Amino acid sequence: IKKYNEILKESYYSSTLPIKNNLTESQVAKFIATKYKYPDVHLKHKFSRYYPKLKSGAHFIGHINRINKKDIKRLKKLGIFETYNGLDHIGKTGIEYFYEDKLHGLPGYKKIEVDAQNNVIRTIESVDPVHGKDIILNIDYKIQKIAEQAFVGYKGAMVALDPNNGEIIAYLSQPSYDPNLFTNGIDETSWKKLNNSIHKPLINRVVSGLYPPGSTI
């Protein structure tokens, strides 16, 4: 209940409250069989961000999370709040945050007429969504993995550039974290573990760490 109350506080503008994500086929079948008991609960197909590389590159890729009041205030100030109607998530850190306006696209919608039993009678209006743009980075994943392996057991930061053009081909902040934890709102236990860790995995040491310069030659 505490979790849902927190979601309600942050998502007061949304018309829906997610109870559970990523249902299995068995869970879907069980719900459908007993749906008559829960007239106000509905199944909904939904796209979800998944980071297949897990901790690898988490600090430059960043992550998304549920839209909160602070995000809404910023979106309204920028005059783009309307483009987020029907959306629940937004980029919070890294590339996800910096290129949010290009990644999120535009939501579609459908206006329908229903009867007293909530059965669809007809579609009044339908607008297809517009997909966000793809972003291709210059990161060389082989070099990225070599850097990560070299930093196992250590804390620090590393950036590798292509000397021919200055492109960033590896970007490492160690230790790292799994951005998938944040996608649908991080749970309290996981948050405390990350936030209270003496190793500070959430800090992007490339841009926020303070280190002596050492030799520049």
Q: What does each model-identified segment do?
A:
Residues 158-163:
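Short hydrophobic alpha-helical segments used for membrane anchoring or interfacial signaling
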Residues 212-216:
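Active-site rim segments in enzyme catalytic domains, especially the processed small/beta chain
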